[in-house]
From Swiss-Prot:
Its cofactor is Fe cation. Fe cation 1 binds at residues 61, 91, 94, 178. Residues 49-217 are annotated as: 2 X approximate tandem repeats. This is NADPH-dependent 3-demethoxyubiquinone 3-hydroxylase, mitochondrial. Catalyzes the hydroxylation of the 5-methoxy-2-methyl-3-(all-trans-polyprenyl)benzoquinone at the C6 position and participates in the biosynthesis of ubiquinone. Catalyzes the reaction through a substrate-mediated reduction pathway, whereby NADH shuttles electrons to 5-methoxy-2-methyl-3-(all-trans-decaprenyl)benzoquinone, which then transfers the electrons to the two Fe(3+) centers. This protein may be expected to contain an N-terminal transit peptide but none has been predicted. Keywords: Iron, Membrane, Metal-binding, Mitochondrion, Mitochondrion inner membrane, Monooxygenase, NAD, Oxidoreductase, Repeat, Ubiquinone biosynthesis. Sequence repeats lie at residues 49-130, 131-217.
Length: 217
């Protein structure tokens, strides 16, 4: 009888241990699954951030190059012509780099490129018709917004823990180029343009809107 009681107790303990081990294993498996899913979501988010950055920067550099081309259509043979051409050539270098990145990283370009093609050239052309001061005012406004945008992107990459050295170095270099263009515009009488402040603010709003749309569409 005592032997039977001991056997029964032993079986109960064994079942309890088995149940505990099963629950523990299930919990461990659940935690592992959650961790794997969490890592997948993190990588997916990082990929989305990179895609958005490359898409909008690709569009932005294309638009900037078109602005300078529009200005050159009017001012190519003036004293400011060579300077504008130099800035245009830099923007084309930026555009070529993002053409490379958009291909290598398989990023879908914005569907709005045909609009930025016309709008960029039109803004450059009309501002140049208003005078070289207005053309430089456009340069200052656009490059101010773009350089700030590049700084925001660098912070976003750091906050998300994205260690893409090529992309970061590209953004840093291009930001510095845009800041140089901004200073060139100021040095060449941008602030003497008619209605400089409201005109500049209007261009900035338009540029920010283009950035917002190109990031998403």
């Amino acid at each position: 009888m005592n032997s039977l009681i001991k056997s029964t107790k032993f079986l109960k303990k064994t079942n309890i241990i088995r149940s505990y081990c099963t629950k523990t294993n299930n919990n461990n498996n659940t935690n592992i699954t959650k961790n794997v899913l969490s890592e997948i979501e993190k990588e997916k988010l990082k990929r989305q951030i990179i895609e958005r950055i490359i898409r909008v920067d690709h569009a932005g550099e294309f638009g900037a190059a078109r602005i300078y081309e529009g200005q050159l259509a009017v001012l190519a043979n003036t004293k400011e012509g060579p300077l504008i051409r130099e800035m245009a050539d830099q923007e084309k270098e930026h555009q070529a780099k993002f053409n490379q990145l958009i291909y290598e990283k398989r990023v879908r370009p914005t569907i709005l490129s045909p609009i930025w093609n016309v709008a960029g050239f039109g803004l450059g052309y009309v501002s140049a018709l208003m005078g070289k001061e207005a053309a430089m005012a456009v340069t200052v406004a656009v490059e101010t917004v773009i350089s700030d945008h590049y700084n925001d992107q660098l912070r976003q990459l750091n906050d998300a823990g994205i260690d893409d050295k090529e992309l970061k170095e590209t953004i840093k270099k291009f930001r510095d180029d845009e800041l140089e263009h901004m200073h060139i515009g100021i040095e060449h009488d941008a602030e003497l343009a008619p209605l400089y402040k409201p005109f500049s603010e209007l261009v900035k709003v338009g540029t920010k809107t283009a950035i917002w749309l190109s990031t998403r569409v």
